[in-house]
Amino acid sequence: MAKHTFFVTGTDTGVGKTIVSAAILEAAKAAGKRTLAMKPIASGCDQTPEGLRNEDALMLQAAITEKLPYDTINPIALEPAIAPHVAAQQAGKQVTAQRIVGFCRGMQIRPADLLLIEGAGGWRVPLNDRETYAAVPGELKLPVILVVPLQLGCINHAMLSAEAIRADGLVVAGWVGNHPEEQVMSCEQDTLNYLSTHLGAPCLGVLPWLENTDTAEMPAILSRYLNITPLIEN
């Protein structure tokens, strides 16, 4: 059974949840830990001879130590590159929190030191007309890792996301500052200082923008900027 399970969310879509997750997995592997990860639902998948494949889920598959089939890591694969609940409707698929919870519990029973479950978009992304993705970590009672893009407006988005997570009865286990774009925001250190003081959770690291780097090499390089001790110390 997975010793530590965390749900990874972001303040928005496109903030780098997958690269942060992969970097955490690489850091855990470097510490001698067995790792698992999954992205239960993914839109924007590509047609391949093996079926629908999502580049984020493939990155997670490459980063884990306990090798698993793709369909176990990404059981709900959707082709349209749009919001998951709309993509599911267009594909004629029913997506519910309980269905995703079932996939996650199936992963949790596998032996590992660390399991990361990556969400889609931000905390309140819809799964259907009645539920949001927040219902999944809520049902599983998972601590949450919050990915914050270091750009204008991120303080407000990070604080609101953390408030929503806690309002749902869950713990923000840590946060990671990420640079999803090359441009560095002005007064970045002031922003980091504010978040470190007011977000109420440990900063696990700040990941730089990597230029002219092979995508496959990024997680291992970025893992050096992380301190994942708060995630694996017990």
Curated annotation (Swiss-Prot):
Residues of the active site are K39
Q: What is its main location?
A: cytoplasm
Q: Name one Pfam family in it.
A: AAA_26
Question: Could you tell me the superkingdom of the organism this chain comes from?
Answer: Bacteria
Q: Does the keyword Metal-binding apply?
A: yes
Q: Where does substrate bind?
A: S43
Supply the alphabetized keyword list.
Answer: ATP-binding, Biotin biosynthesis, Cytoplasm, Ligase, Magnesium, Metal-binding, Nucleotide-binding
Q: What is this protein called?
A: ATP-dependent dethiobiotin synthetase BioD
Name the lineage: Bacteria, Pseudomonadati, Pseudomonadota, Gammaproteobacteria, Pseudomonadales
